């Protein structure tokens, strides 16, 4: 038995300079696991609650001392002596202890930090890398990265309403090559922007945040960069969008303020469909607002056979909401964010439910990240096939890419890079 003998929570800082929760878990054998949780900017209204102090005299009210206190008192008392190898029992203990539907009492940030740190300690105790501990011998598939090269919306201060424009190296022969292709396109895009006199400042997730006249102009810049780097758009590198449409949905319409447009769900669907016809876009995330289920149905019926339609704010990594979406034929993919739900067991349950329904599961970072690379291991452990973890800059993003490079090396000849096959929800 790998008994938990000590737990220490602390307040650390994320990539935006805001406080977040880190936790150390010590086992009887002397082995320690450490984990830090991320934090989002554009958040779904039904996400598990991230506990913040609200004390304006500290960190503008964003301190997490109450969450840390919960770890060091109540949570510690409940889990000391438990077997770290019993992840599902530990997570259920945390859920029952919290007693709310949204983890609002103890805080999803406190609970997730403990859940992750316990898993890390148990993996260390077993002598296995984290991906192997979670996934067993079948964990051999690297994820296709969706690299956010142009940021807008809540992730940047520019004229773009859509939050992310991504490159997806579907034609690469390996993860290592996929990363190289992405880096080369990133640097080609930087040169193009520089030569046009456009800012090369980066947003929260490491992508560029240019002010350009339209979303199509931004897409065309990416296509130029793919060509300049020596790759073929569509065949080798596809495109993905994260609209984060809840952020610009108001009074029943979608307001693209940067372009002076106010659109119904039908008109907005028509606009996205026109982009899909014109450009090699194979994935659209949060194309509709989280509450506009009629709009989601419209979008899924129109584009869902040829385009991955990903629910993020829509599903918030929650199996109850995902089940409803599957029954109603809404979307064909779920974005997986561990801090939206607050424990690893519930995260794995959402991935499993998606796969059983023929939906893909895209493992994702948050805009406020840390050096913690757990999501890289989760992507391989679950054979998810896809990961979103930012652009080719900022060490909080590179930590995940670098961990995946290590995992691919560790797997050696058995490593699989699925490429376009990762999009098994498309016909």
From Swiss-Prot:
Active site location: 205 (proton donor), 337 (proton acceptor)
Residues at which Mg(2+) binds: 242, 285, 312
One Gene Ontology term from the biological process aspect of the record: glycolytic process
Name assigned to this protein: Enolase
Annotated localization: Cytoplasm; Secreted; Cell surface
Pfam family, one: Enolase_N
Single GO MF descriptor: magnesium ion binding
CDD domains, alphabetized: enolase
Catalytic activity: (2R)-2-phosphoglycerate = phosphoenolpyruvate + H2O
Keywords: Cytoplasm, Glycolysis, Lyase, Magnesium, Metal-binding, Secreted
GO cellular component, one term: phosphopyruvate hydratase complex
This protein's pathway: Carbohydrate degradation; glycolysis; pyruvate from D-glyceraldehyde 3-phosphate: step 4/5
Cross-referenced Gene3D superfamilies: Enolase-like C-terminal domain, Enolase-like, N-terminal domain
Cofactor: Mg(2+)
Location, primary (coarse class): cytoplasm
Domain of life: Bacteria
PROSITE patterns (UniProt xref): ENOLASE (PS00164)
InterPro entries, per the entry: Enolase, Enolase-like_C_sf, Enolase-like_N, Enolase_C, Enolase_CS, Enolase_N
Natural source organism: Leptothrix cholodnii (strain ATCC 51168 / LMG 8142 / SP-6)
Residues that bind (2R)-2-phosphoglycerate: 163, 337, 366-367, 388
Family recorded in the similarity comment: Belongs to the enolase family.
Function: Catalyzes the reversible conversion of 2-phosphoglycerate (2-PG) into phosphoenolpyruvate (PEP). It is essential for the degradation of carbohydrates via glycolysis.
Cofactor binding mode and count: Binds a second Mg(2+) ion via substrate during catalysis.
Enzyme nomenclature, EC number: 4.2.1.11
Keyword Metal-binding: yes
Gene: eno
